[in-house]
Amino acid sequence: MNRLYTPISTLAVLGLSAGLLTACGDSAPISLPTTPVPGTPAPTPIATPKVRFIAFGDAGRGNENQNAVGAAMAQLCKLKGCDFGIETGDNFYEVGVTSVTDTQWQTAFELPYKDLNIPIYPALGNHDNADTDVGEGANNAKGNFQVDYTTSPGSSGKWKMPARYHAFTAPLSAAATPLIEFFVLDSSPLAATLPNPAETEYNYLTYGPTQLQWFQTALMASKAKWTVAFSHHPYISNGEHGNAGNFDGAGMFPVGTTDGQPWKDLMDESACAMGLDFHIFGHDHDLEWLKPVASCNAKTEFILSGAGSDVRAFGDATLNPAYFQQDLAQGFFWFEVTATSFTGEMHVLKDLKLQVDAAGQPMPMFTRTVTK
Amino acid sequence: MKYLLTLAVLLLPLSAFAARLVGDGFSIELPQGWESRQGVMDVPLMARPPQASDAEGWGQDLLTVTVEKADKRRTCLEGFTQRKLKEFAYHASQFEKLEELPLELQGRVATLLTLRYREGPRELMAYVLILDAGNRFLTATVTSSPARFEFQRAKFRSAVESLRPASTRSKKR
């Protein structure tokens, strides 16, 4: 996305208000001239560097529900500002896309988010790598089409998946000091429900360690104020799939990746061992902001945003302590981050509409701020 | 003095390697000072340089060992090697097999592959040593960035070629 970085003094000379900058969601630090230009208004205070983004997931159905969430996110971003979005996987149901020209690029991405004019950074989910409706995750080639779409001539340019796993910093302007570093993880090969886990074609035994090594190294080297990992699969969840290591109750009969134990191991050795700030994920089709748990450094906060289209009831709503959680309703999260605060708002749709007050202002169902 | 000098010269090639590490179904000699973990993510062995003394190596160099059962009525070393190549390519892009060498290690047949591929944001080179251990295949893989790999080829190759079968234990999970 080409974003406007116009010095405030220039805007003042042009007679434009500084409010324009915040309305477009710009997050770059702004320098003011030390000597005011004669005849110009008094300098506006230096803007605090700020990043705003939305998180949504499990969305890719190309149906009325997805379109409604897309419209609600566009409405909210217009009112409050968004620099970019993150999508927590299962971007295309039930079995991913088969090329960079698959019709689902239009029906389940470009059209539902046509009014959302910001970059979207997606993670891959089990349905993105699947050959069957259960989303077994046995066809990584389909996920690779999603990587390829990033540079495809047919793309609107919003889709940003340069690799199956990667990192980026925000503000997105390379010149700005990073406030947040995002680590986009590929959880599916470590949590797939494969028909034959012993089949070496799907073997995660090398991919797991190399991804772990990359994540640990990148996390260790991060200079950002806040660190956020996002993936499709949870570490903990009160939704139908449950916690990693016992996904869908498979922990009693552990075979290969089905119970998600390899994915849990990756998180334990990296995010949990090294004190990640936030893990945002999907897989379960609801909204949760879960409290830190002792098994993961008692600091990392877990945010589930998987209500981007069709939704489900909780599996066990008391499995993990939550600050707030909502099932059976479409929704998404909006975040505003500064050097000292990380605020998240859970927006739950009512009758497939963004909830607003009498003045037309968005009404989040839940808000939480974490400070440093 | 002359005797000590001779002894030092004789021991020099060995000094780059630590004692033989014995795992579940395999043994291997790791490069000196490398630290190892067993069983994380179901991987029998993961090893790399220590973070405290070699942060760059910790972030780039990685050795893994896997032990996989084989039905020898159906699978030979050549067939298993093809499956391994397919597995690496499955998770990678820009995948290239640079070399495939047949080896014999203490009477057991093995294949040494040299690979180059992209995984996630990284370009990697790898030695993959596949050893026929009777009813199972052992695989030692060492990966690093191309630059570090070229610089450490001898050390990496010695490590993977030290892979040997050992007795197996019962499955943990």
Model-derived features: where do they sit?
Chain A
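Bacterial N-terminal signal peptides that target proteins for export
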Residues: 1-12
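C-terminal motif of bacterial Sec signal peptides marking the signal peptidase cleavage site
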Residues: 20-23
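Structured segments of extracytoplasmic/periplasmic soluble domains
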Residues: 56-62, 72-79, 108, 112-115, ...
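Active-site glycine-centered loops adjacent to acidic/histidine catalytic or metal-binding residues
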Residues: 58, 89-90, 125-126, 185, ...
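Extended active-site neighborhood of metal-dependent phosphoesterases/phosphodiesterases
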Residues: 93-227, 241-262, 266-267, 275-278, ...
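A short C-terminal boundary segment appended to hydrolase-like catalytic domains
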Residues: 322-372
